[in-house]
């Protein structure tokens, strides 16, 4: 969903449609061979015959995003943003251009180094989570930053620290290219709100993104700290609608760059004993086209659906029952011919009244809402909550606060698995 709308909890925009129910089960597993989408089928990225070899280690992804760690979204971390002197600016570039990196560089480095700690990752593991998705900007690879782009340097040192913490805790990692050269969005998560122009969709900016993907792929296979990385997502939430070259140029070439890089390192997806990365694309439900139309969809590909119920359902469905009805009936997670992860979702609501966290019966509703979200995600390959932590007093965007509030059980084995019975 559009993240400035998401962040302010105001109404958002979406071209995504509501789909009907399905009983299909989609897994990321290491011992299953089925590769087609049928009722009650399991779609695998790995099999026991040795014909494929990937880095996935879990059956169902249960994870959290590390939002606002390497790309600050001001709505999520208002205290940090104020400490930067950036209050009122809506993106990193907007503030950087005015205050300058001479002032801000050390503040970014302090944030990268301290917003998370090793203890966060041990706590994630304790809560039954197995995956972290790390939203990253292209400027982690400094050679791709143009002279006129005022973004802080030096973040890769801290990315390495972060993936190492995940590795130490036994968590697998998805590297998500969240902010792309030239902007794939005008929202704050793209790092640049200084213009309404979206300029990513060009050969020159694609080339910079390919350089990032090559760098990350190399690190995933050569740097021990990055051995926890199991997947790369080449673009997060591109501008909706059919964008020039996204489907027929960028998507297949991104796949080729990753696979060619792996091949040069002696890593293949076919029986070598080496473990290739999964490549994850936004699903067609996002509204920017069907990525499977121009890629090799059998080449260890997965899809990402951002299951923000509050912006997907019609206004008439913005009730407690409407939210649960949608989640229990939707087949969004099984509509692609491949494993689909709900790569972002939250417990945020739109509609007021009975949907407010302070309304009568709120605890019972939000427990059911969380269980239904998890149910919907696990119809597919799993789910990743947005986000593990914020600086908000919000139980709906912050996984830790949601657990403390009783919305999500501290032990995921206690989630209500009967929430969708009868649908």
Write out the residue ranges for each language-model feature:
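C-terminal membrane-anchoring module of eukaryotic surface/secreted proteins
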Residues: 1-15
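N-terminal carbohydrate-binding accessory modules
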Residues: 21, 26-129
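Substrate-binding cleft of secreted/luminal carbohydrate-active enzymes
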Residues: 62, 334-420
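Hydrophobic faces of well-ordered beta-strands that scaffold small-molecule active sites
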Residues: 62-66, 132-134, 173-177, 230-232, ...
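Aromatic- and acidic-residue-enriched segments that line the glycan-binding/catalytic groove
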Residues: 74-89, 150-153, 182-200
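An active-site-proximal structural segment forming one wall of the substrate-binding cleft
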Residues: 110-132, 147-179, 190-231, 257
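Short acidic/His/Gly/Ser-rich catalytic and metal-binding motifs that mark active-site loops
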Residues: 140-144, 181-191, 349-353
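Extracellular glycoside hydrolase catalytic/binding regions
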Residues: 224, 228-231, 235-374
